[in-house]
């Protein structure tokens, strides 16, 4: 692993990087997979959908705990990661150091900003942006996409995952799922999700929630040819340990998300919480 600690001289003002500290990374989605030495399904899916091969080069923007970096290296891919959080750099560096030499030597990490990529034109075959879009203000996000297009090779691909889906937060959750969860909690003595629509952390860092239409608009403006879809992760029944709990989970998805109708329009627009995109540079 090559550890390059730099500060971009062209950083754009955005969310304070100090908000992304050790406590933040221990609490966010997928942390339990990382603590168990596993790869979260989200990152496995991103790699599978990308079509990346081991002879390709990749950039991971906003690497966080370093989960995707390590997953790509295990596939034989030479990957560079950037993040502007100092804590992210330290967390990822420690995790990468525990990996076998043939994997960790394929990873480079850089302390840098997503809006001013410190790479030459046409440097990478693939760029991954998983759970970064919603953390960038609109001008930052457009600049980041412009930079991605610049450093991608011809026919290179940008793989994007962002959550939450703004329509889910504005309509699906508060108007249907949250009240339905409260009913199920009373009927079956469960502890289903009844959180605020947006937590304090969400309000601090999720400053640019997307819909499939708004994300498409950014990518079109940048000049990418893109495919955008809503992921089914959130609205598909989770596998449970016992038949009784599985039955309850299936009933919850039916009751709270209208499953399996939640997999198709217009229901998926309101209940699917994951937005994916693959954008290609001509």
PLM-predicted stretches and their roles:
Residues 280-282:
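C-terminal beta-strand of the catalytic ATP-binding
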Residues 76, 104-106, 155, 223-226:
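A generic structural signal for alpha->beta connector loops
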Residues 134-136:
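A short His-aromatic
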Residues 13, 18, 22-24, 30-37, ...:
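S-adenosyl-L-methionine-dependent methyltransferase catalytic module, highlighting the catalytic core
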Residues 1-120, 126-130, 142-145, 231-232, ...:
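Conserved N-terminal segment of class I S-adenosyl-L-methionine
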